[in-house]
């Protein structure tokens, strides 16, 4: 039924069939009082055109924002689609809110269908359309976003205060909408996902508000509108059913708590898992060799804490903007389940570093001085292009105890499955932990999620000439970005960008 409303919207709000009139008089406010100040508006291409089927003269009563003073009245002339005059008024209200910040309370419009026929005067009548009410009760805040895909919209949604936000299109409801638009200049058809404050007494009017707003902001004519509305603060949370954790990285727990933000585990490119929220404390070494404390909160896969700590260590190692800036030495981790009732944001604990904390990278442990290093799609190209990595000093080295060769299967951020092959220095006493470290490493650099891998390790210089093989597991060709799985079966990964850095080094 929502889509049916959208199809009506195509015909009634933003009619796109070119017909008479091709242009109308356009003016706003005082300019409408003097005909010599009226300008010609081309209905098919003007940024402020609200249709192609009619010319119209609208009388509006408005406030300059929801917190403005006395109401003002003015006239607006231009191109409209007046098949449904109420929808035309809502479209005008959406355009004026986005362009001038006006909150249109009432609107009356008279229309005609000849070129520049809108020379008439319109006054507000008792039957004027009520549009955006300032005294309405409803929502105080909603989530706000506008992106080309739903996952990114959810990930980037921010708080919007309905009465003060310039982008808000009402104060009674929160909305989530998928709209299809056509750019009036290029003809490009785009799909957008939108959340925000809106007036949604009926969905057709709400879609008309969006149509007017889009016409000004995007120079685009709305073709379809599929909208859902609710009337509780933040009720349009796209992540309501998704696991969420607090996320921060600081020197101590107090600073982390003061600066922490929301992390959506299945969508955030920095998420280190989907099954748990965690708080970690420990020691790290910076690029100058200084030992420092750290405190971290975020999403984890914490069924095995050692692997979770190695994932964090590998993630920090993969910082290509600050190579070698963070080498994780010790890790004390506490985890909780965000999937239980009221479990989201459960990682509020402050663990204390204990003598038996998990050791991650051990730079002083002796092992091979150097290993073969490469990052390619398969073993053949890896062997052809491999270089030498000095384990103790290379900023991207993942250990000093072993040389390793790994093959893996990964999910890219767009959901596609890919394979990769890596050789390099690594701590490989525990293969599962080694896999976790490199999984975190690749997550930082390429935002890839590790699914499966096989790794073989050795302890002599440049001994990593192995060719491990994956045990095939049936996988879909692609998967939604909202689904992130970890099949830690000796998983190990690395990064193309890093390989370039190795060559430079």
Curated annotation (Swiss-Prot):
Its main location: membrane. It is found in: Membrane. Keywords: Membrane, Signal, Transmembrane, Transmembrane helix. The chain crosses the membrane at residues 484-504. GO terms for cellular component: membrane. Component of the acid-insoluble and acid-soluble organic matrix of the aragonitic skeleton (at protein level). Residues 1-19 form the signal peptide. It is a single-pass membrane protein. Residues 20-483 are extracellular. Coiled coil: none annotated. Residues 505 are cytoplasmic. This is Uncharacterized skeletal organic matrix protein 2. It comes from Acropora millepora (Staghorn coral).
């Amino acid at each position: 039924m929502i889509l049916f409303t959208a199809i009506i919207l195509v015909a009634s709000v933003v009619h796109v069939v070119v017909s008479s009139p091709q242009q109308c008089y356009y003016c706003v406010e005082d300019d409408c009082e003097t005909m010599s100040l009226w300008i010609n508006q081309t209905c098919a291409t003007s940024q402020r055109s609200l249709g192609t089927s009619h010319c119209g003269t609208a009388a509006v009563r408005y406030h300059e924002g929801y917190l403005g003073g006395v109401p003002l009245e003015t006239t607006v002339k231009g191109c409209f689609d007046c098949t449904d005059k109420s929808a035309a008024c809502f479209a005008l209200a959406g355009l004026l809110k986005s362009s001038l910040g006006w909150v249109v309370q009432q609107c009356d419009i008279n229309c005609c269908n000849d070129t520049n026929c809108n020379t008439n005067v319109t006054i507000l009548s008792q039957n004027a359309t009520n549009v955006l009410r300032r005294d309405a009760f409803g929502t105080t805040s909603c989530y706000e976003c506008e992106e080309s895909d739903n996952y990114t919209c959810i990930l980037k949604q921010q708080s919007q205060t309905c009465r003060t936000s310039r982008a808000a299109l009402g104060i009674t409801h929160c909305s989530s909408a998928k709209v299809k638009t056509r750019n009036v200049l290029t003809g490009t058809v785009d799909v957008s996902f939108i959340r925000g404050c809106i007036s949604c007494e009926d969905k057709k009017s709400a879609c008309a508000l969006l149509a007017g707003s889009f016409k000004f902001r995007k120079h685009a004519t709305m073709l379809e509108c599929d909208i859902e509305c609710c009337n509780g603060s933040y009720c349009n949370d796209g992540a309501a059913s998704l696991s969420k954790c607090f996320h921060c990285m600081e020197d101590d727990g107090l600073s982390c708590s003061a600066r922490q933000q929301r992390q959506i585990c299945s969508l955030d490119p920095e998420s280190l898992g989907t099954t748990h929220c965690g708080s970690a404390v420990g020691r790290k070494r910076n690029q100058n060799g200084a030992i420092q404390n750290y405190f971290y909160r975020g999403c984890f896969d914490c069924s095995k804490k050692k692997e979770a700590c190695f994932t964090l260590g590998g993630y920090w190692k993969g910082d290509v903007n600050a190579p070698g800036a963070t080498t994780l030495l010790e890790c004390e981790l506490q985890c909780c389940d965000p999937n239980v009732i009221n479990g989201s944001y459960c990682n509020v604990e402050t663990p204390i570093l204990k003598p038996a904390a998990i050791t991650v990278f051990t730079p002083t442990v002796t092992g091979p001085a150097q290993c073969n290093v490469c990052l390619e799609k398969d073993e053949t190209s890896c062997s052809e292009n491999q270089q030498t990595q000095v384990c103790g000093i290379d900023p991207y080295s993942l250990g000093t105890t072993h040389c390793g060769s790994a093959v893996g299967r990964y999910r890219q951020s767009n959901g596609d499955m890919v394979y990769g092959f890596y050789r390099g220095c690594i701590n490989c006493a525990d293969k599962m932990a080694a896999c976790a470290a490199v999984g975190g490493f690749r997550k930082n650099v390429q935002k890839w999620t590790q699914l499966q891998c096989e790794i073989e390790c050795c302890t002599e210089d440049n001994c990593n000439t192995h060719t491990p093989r994956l045990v095939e597991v049936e996988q879909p060709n692609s998967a939604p970005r909202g689904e992130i799985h970890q099949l830690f079966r000796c998983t190990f990964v690395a990064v193309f960008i890093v390989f370039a850095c190795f060559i430079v080094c």
